[in-house]
Each structure stands twice: as structure tokens, then as C-alpha cells.
Regions:
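Acidic/His/Gly-enriched intrinsically disordered linker/tail segments
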Residues: 116-125, 129-167
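Conserved alpha/beta core surface patches that mediate binding of polyanionic ligands
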Residues: 1-6
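Juxtacatalytic substrate-recognition/specificity segment
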Residues: 8-134
Length: 167
């Protein structure tokens, strides 16, 4: 993994760990403070998380984007220079908003996909590909809530959320 930077914060009895793999000059204190209301929103929405710890494990890269949910963690890939730097304004630029949205999306999956799921995902036949018709609802609902959660926690304005919906 190389250089790893870890920060921990607590929300409603759950410890959240923000791990960056790769060098960063980002304002990690700000990122943690921005993630706190987002995590609380999700915990309140689903009446808590059965796990005591949740991990945001982020591979910082030059150019790349994505996430993969797990039961108590997510593996993220995000460009290092799109995170907020120390001494920047409190305004959330679009690129940083995408990081918060990605975190929101993958955390939402801790319930919607990892705990709320169809039978085919509970006991999958791993000897062959498994197709399901419900994937659109899992990704669709999660995609709806990732940015909606940013608006509900006031990390972005209602106007910004309306612009996202318009895209």
C-alpha cells in the first residue's frame, strides 16, 4: 500500500476510519468534519449500523474514480488533487463534492445491497455468472440518495442539488 494516512472520527457510537493510500496534502480535518453529518444522516435513516467500525479506504491517484462497497468498508479511488487543501475556502467545489457523493453512495450500500438484498445475493451460485433484474433498483436508489444526502445535510445547497438532477 505504501504511505498510508489514517484518521478516525465517531458518530452515534460508530467509529469511522478515513484511510488514504498515497501522499496527500489534503485538509483531512475538513474532510472528516464534512463526512460526520453525512454519516449521521445515513445512520439515522437506517437506525444505526450493526458494525462498530466503518472504513473509507481511499487510493489516491492522478486520475481515476470509483468505489466498491463491502459490509463494513468501502474501497475508493479518487484523484488526490481534487480533495480540498488546507487554507482553502469552505466552499465545496464540484470535484470535492464528487468525493463526498462517492462516500455517501458507498456508505448507503452498507444497507442497500449489503443488508437489503434479494435471495440471489444471499446464496449465490459462484460456479457461473448470476444475473438479476433488480440491480437497477439497488444502484438507482443509491444514486438518488448519494447527492440527496448531501443536500439534506446542507453540504450542498438545494440549488446545487437541482443542478445535479438536471444533468
Amino acid at each position: 500500500l505504501g504511505l498510508v494516512e489514517k484518521h478516525t472520527f465517531e458518530v452515534a457510537g460508530t467509529r469511522f476510519h478515513l484511510v488514504f493510500s498515497g501522499k496527500t496534502e489534503a485538509d483531512v480535518e475538513r474532510i472528516c468534519n464534512d463526512l460526520k453529518p453525512l454519516c449521521k444522516h445515513h445512520l439515522d435513516l437506517f437506525n444505526g449500523l450493526p458494525e462498530n467500525d466503518y472504513w473509507f479506504i481511499t487510493l489516491l491517484c492522478e486520475d481515476g474514480f470509483g468505489g466498491l462497497e463491502h459490509r463494513a468498508s468501502t474501497a475508493l479511488m479518487f484523484p488526490r488533487f481534487h480533495l480540498p487543501m488546507r487554507c482553502e475556502s469552505d466552499i465545496i467545489p464540484e470535484q470535492y463534492q464528487q468525493f463526498l457523493s462517492l462516500c455517501s453512495h458507498e456508505l448507503f450500500h452498507a444497507w442497500n445491497v449489503k443488508r437489503i438484498k434479494p435471495e440471489i445475493m444471499i446464496s449465490p451460485d459462484l460456479s457461473s455468472e448470476q444475473y438479476m433484474e433488480q440491480l437497477w433498483i439497488y444502484e438507482g436508489f443509491t444514486s438518488l440518495y448519494d447527492d440527496l444526502s448531501l443536500a439534506r445535510t446542507k453540504l450542498i445547497s438545494a440549488q446545487s442539488y437541482a443542478e445535479i438532477l438536471g444533468q
